[in-house]
């Protein structure tokens, strides 16, 4: 499956839907979606990872990038995180900087 990062907005929330594998080759596309989400001025960023099948270290760095790019008062929620992806996020210790809802 090809990687897809799709941004939608509404009601003060920017949602980025991720599908496929988030790795070094695809992280720049996710960075672009994060920049676009920040530009909306949304008070909440939702990252829908329900179709994300794999996350590499570059994907983890992209999550850190997201946390650094948004304002401190913006909530970032990871929703629909699959067990394999959640395991990697937890092993990296990134589960404390985000509101995470597993699938």
Where do the language-model regions lie?
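Short beta-strand/loop segment at the start of cytosolic alpha/beta domains
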Residues: 1-17
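Amphipathic alpha-helical interaction surfaces in cytosolic regulatory modules
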Residues: 24-97
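Short acidic-hydrophobic, aromatic-tinged amphipathic segments that line or gate anion-handling sites
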Residues: 99-103
